Amino acid sequence: MIISSTFDYRKAAKRRLPPFLFHYIDGGAYAEETMRRNYADLQALALRQRILRQVGEVDLSIKLFDQRLNLPIVLAPVGLTGMYARRGEVKAARAAVAKGIPFTLSSVSVCSLAEVHAEVGSGFWFQLYVLKDRGFMRDVLERSWLAGVRTLVFTVDMPVPGARYRDAHSGMSGPYAGLRRILQAVVHPHWAWNVGIMGRPHDLGNVSTYLQKKITLEDYVGWLGANFDPSIGWSDLQWIRDFWKGKMILKGILDPQDAREAVQFGADGIVVSNHGGRQLDGVLSTARALPAIAEVVTGDLTILADSGVRSGLDVVRMIAQGADAVMIGRAFIYALAAAGEKGVMHLLDLFANEMRVAMTLTGVRAVKEITHESLASTDALNQ
């Protein structure tokens, strides 16, 4: 199969993965309207083509916090990445290091902080939810610091898990889910051998380390559901801000007022995000939400954005809308599932080449030159 885009990697991943895993990463909340709009609204942003601009060499690098990145891209935190390829978090982290960008380890990863650190050293980021078990939160923050993590991504848009209809149909949840997953693995022998058997242990590495017992995938949904805390407020995060001495990013901002409060709270950055359309269906796409947020907090903190990004062109669009850098999640998981570490590296090369073409044809030499003037019109998003 010829692979030339994220969409090709998606097709390859769909063939290779058992349905319960493919649809878990591919699906969204409820009727998936927001998930679809995330992509559609980005495509509605027309780039402003310019000619004879003497562009020459294009510089894709940026400085993000204290890191120099080769691309304005960060691999987003994705739970259970280690189920999409054998020791998937390690492979994705190695690919990110090879391409000079950060990898963000999810707190509900298969591979633990210690395992990832042993493979790639320091420099990766870590993601954490607000959970009822404050002991776990403190413990994992201490372990992440010892592993060399200096950037914490705090997910704030998940006080309760979103309802994802696809999961019940695919076997991730619903009646006879365990039996259905076993049957799916039988008819996907490559995944069953390479990941299902050779990729063990399949536990939540960071949680198991804290509880000192194996937390299997069967326990995954129950453990998360029991620990999400819908009663949290800004004051509940203050101890974390005081405790954590590194950079702190709040992920899941969609409203300008919340962005202002993030500045007042002392966040170093935000991720404008609707969780890839996986939490509350019917909310604004990131492409729609981003400009108003950028208008009120640009210069006060670093702005990242995710949701709907499938190409280097989409990265340029997000930056033109006000982002300093972009996170990608589904896209790199498709590549990881299809071709492992090399797949993620190839995907990032595709993104880089697409960015170079887009920047050259819009007349900009460096990422910092991408502005709202790089867009021809946003009328389609403002109707």
Swiss-Prot record:
Keyword annotations from UniProtKB, A to Z: Cell inner membrane, Cell membrane, Flavoprotein, FMN, Membrane, Oxidoreductase
Cofactor list: FMN
EC number(s) reported in the record: 1.1.-.-
Active-site feature positions: H275 (proton acceptor)
GO molecular function term, any single one: L-lactate dehydrogenase activity
SUPFAM superfamilies noted in UniProt: FMN-linked oxidoreductases
Binding site for substrate: Y24, Y129, R164, R278
Topology in membrane: Peripheral membrane protein
PROSITE patterns named in the record: FMN_HYDROXY_ACID_DH_1 (PS00557), FMN_HYDROXY_ACID_DH_2 (PS51349)
Name of the protein in its database record: L-lactate dehydrogenase
Family as reported in the entry's similarity comment: Belongs to the FMN-dependent alpha-hydroxy acid dehydrogenase family.
Domain spans labelled FMN hydroxy acid dehydrogenase: 1-380
GO terms (BP aspect): aerobic respiration; lactate metabolic process
